[in-house]
Swiss-Prot record:
Belongs to the Lgt family. It holds the Pfam family LGT. InterPro entries: Lgt. Its main location: membrane. It is found in: Cell inner membrane. It comes from Haemophilus influenzae (strain PittEE). NCBIfam families: lgt. This is Phosphatidylglycerol--prolipoprotein diacylglyceryl transferase. The chain crosses the membrane at residues 23-43, 62-82, 97-117, 132-152, 179-199, 206-226, 241-261. Its EC number is 2.5.1.145. A 1,2-diacyl-sn-glycero-3-phospho-(1'-sn-glycerol) binds at residue 145. The lineage of its organism: Bacteria, Pseudomonadati, Pseudomonadota, Gammaproteobacteria, Pasteurellales.
Length: 268
C-alpha cells in the first residue's frame, strides 16, 4: 500500500439499525430522502409562481409517483442490468432492498412511467411534466453519489493522480479515482446549474427534458472512463454504463432538435 495517498476510514453505511436486524436507516437512504425533500421544496417554489400551471397538490402527487418510480425502477434496473445472474440463481434477491443496489437508468425508466401516469391523470401534456421534473433531479443524483462514497462502493480505476484515494474494502488497496465524487460534481451540481439557468430563458417545450438526457448521458459517459466497471465491457470498448448512456444522448439530441423545430411552442 502506498502511504502517499489518502486512506479512507471504514464508514459505517448504517446510521442506526433496529436491534440485530438489517432494518434501519442508511446513509444512502438518507441521501435519497434529502434529495426528495429538496426536490419538493424547489418544485413547490416553482409551482407558487404566477401562471406556473401547477398546484401544490399536483406537485405532491407527481413527486409521490416519482418516488415510487425511482425506488421500483432503480431496484429492478440494478438487478436486470447488473445482477441478472444473481437474480436467476436466487429470484428473491430482487426484494432484498436492504442490501442496497439501485440503478440510475432503471430509476429513470421508473420516473418516465410515473410522469406518463401523472400526465394522464392530471390531463397534462407529457412534455410539460418532463420539463418540470428534469431540473429537480440532478441535486438528488449528486447526493446519491455522496451516498455511494460513504458506502465505499462504485469506486474508480487505479490511478496515480495526487487526489487518488485508497478504499479500505478494496482487496488490493490500490490508489483509485474517487469517481463517486466526480459524478456528484458533474451529474449533481454542474447539471443542476445548467438546467436551472436554462429554464430562466424562453425555450420550446420538451427542450429541458432533452437537455437533461444529453447532460447526464455525456457526464456519466465521461466518468465511466475512470470508474471501475461493475460488469464486463461491451466488445471490450465501452462499459455497460456507457452503453446505457448512448441512447440517452441520442434520444436527448433528437428531442432537442424536435423541440426547436416547433417554433410555436415557446415557453417564456
Amino acid at each position: 500500500m502506498n502511504s502517499n495517498y489518502l486512506l479512507l476510514p471504514h464508514f459505517d453505511p448504517s446510521i442506526f439499525t433496529l436491534g440485530d436486524s438489517n432494518i434501519g436507516l442508511r446513509w444512502y437512504g438518507l441521501m435519497y430522502l434529502l434529495g426528495f425533500v429538496f426536490a419538493r421544496w424547489l418544485a413547490v417554489r416553482r409551482a407558487n409562481r404566477p401562471n406556473s400551471g401547477w398546484t401544490v397538490d399536483q406537485v405532491d402527487s407527481l413527486l409521490f409517483n416519482g418516488f415510487m418510480g425511482v425506488f421500483i425502477g432503480g431496484r429492478v434496473g440494478d438487478v436486470f442490468f447488473y445482477n441478472l445472474d444473481h437474480f436467476l440463481q436466487e429470484p428473491l434477491y430482487l426484494f432484498r432492498v436492504w442490501e442496497g443496489g439501485m440503478s440510475f437508468h432503471g430509476g429513470l425508466i421508473g420516473v418516465i412511467v410515473a410522469m406518463i401516469w401523472t400526465s394522464y391523470s392530471q390531463k397534462r401534456n407529457f412534455w410539460q411534466t418532463a420539463d418540470f421534473v428534469a431540473p429537480l433531479i440532478p441535486f438528488g443524483l449528486g447526493l446519491g453519489r455522496i451516498g455511494n462514497f460513504i458506502n465505499l462502493e462504485l469506486w474508480g480505476r487505479e490511478t496515480n493522480v495526487p487526489w487518488a484515494m485508497i478504499f479500505p474494502n478494496d482487496p488490493l488497496l490500490l490508489p483509485r479515482h474517487p469517481s463517486q465524487l466526480y459524478e456528484a460534481f458533474l451529474e449533481g451540481l454542474v447539471l443542476f446549474a445548467i438546467l436551472n439557468i436554462f429554464i430562466k430563458k424562453p425555450r420550446p417545450m420538451a427542450s429541458v427534458a432533452g437537455l437533461f438526457l444529453i447532460g447526464y448521458g455525456v457526464f456519466r459517459f465521461i466518468v465511466e472512463y475512470v470508474r471501475e466497471p461493475e460488469v464486463e465491457n461491451f466488445f471490450g470498448i465501452i462499459t455497460r454504463g456507457q452503453a446505457l448512456c448512448l441512447p440517452m444522448i441520442i434520444g436527448g439530441a433528437f428531442i432537442m432538435a424536435w423541440a426547436y423545430s416547433r417554433k410555436s411552442a415557446v415557453i417564456k
